[in-house]
Amino acid sequence: TIPRWLAMTLLFIGFVGIWQLATSMVWVSPIILPSPGETLNDLIFVGENLVTGGYMLTAFWTTTQTVFWGFLIALGIGFSLGVLVGETKFGERAVLPYLVAIDTMPKIAFAPLFIAWLGFGISSKVALAAFIATFPIVVSTAAGLYAASENERMLFKAMGATRMQTLLRLKLPTGLPFMFTGLKIAAVGVMAGVITGEFLGGGKGFGALIRQSASQMDTPRVFALILYLSLLGLLLYFTVLWAQRRIVFWQKEEQAGPVG
């Protein structure tokens, strides 16, 4: 089999080659798709601005803070609701139907409401990001609590374990792989929520810079900003993956990635 690094390198070279060919032959308008060289120049410009502490560093730090708080709030709410749904009849019968109903809605459409409720500051972006990222955590946590086999549950019951002991020593350890799958999905969702909020609600984040560059038809700058945002998303995703491999140490490495 081809090593992963070689396959990824060949795919990247092929992608950039087709991209360069399409722009040099003017198959696509430069306004729509800039050349790799133009994009690289803007990548360098944005990178220098980030390193020297310019206005883009302030914007990137604002977006990073929003992502962090949105993910942290989603983790707290999602885990709590997941335990409620997975451990209680009330949660399963009364709360879960409402959660499913809300989850079926296009959550990005709630962005104007959060802006109207919380204003144009960072709070509305954090709330939208947490709102989008909460549901995968709820579902994965509840599913993880059901993962323990009936024999294991009966064994704990026969040994006189309390409900809390069964939860902490059996259900949570067994369900951790499921929960981390939800966290990795949430890591992607929280990025979408933050950028959508910055698109619509303005502010000083990278999303606002992308909107400004797009309005000026500065496509290379838009591509460069998006690529740096993808690095932030990858950092969050691989942080969760790293935590999974440290905490769920009994799980095989190939089972821990890319999403489960």
Which sequence ranges carry the predicted segments?
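Transmembrane alpha-helical segments of polytopic membrane transport and secretion proteins
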Residues: T1-I13, F238-G260
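Alpha-helical membrane-interface segments at transmembrane helix boundaries
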Residues: P3, L57-W69, E92, L99-I102, ...
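Transmembrane alpha-helices
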Residues: A127, F131, M164-T196, A224, ...
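Short cytoplasmic-facing helical segments at TM-TM junctions of multi-pass membrane proteins
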Residues: I137-F180, I210
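Periplasmic/extracellular loop-to-transmembrane helix junction in inner-membrane transport proteins
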Residues: M25-L72
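Hydrophobic alpha-helical transmembrane segments of polytopic membrane proteins
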Residues: G207-W242
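Generic hydrophobic transmembrane alpha-helix motif, especially the helices
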Residues: V100-P136, A143-G144
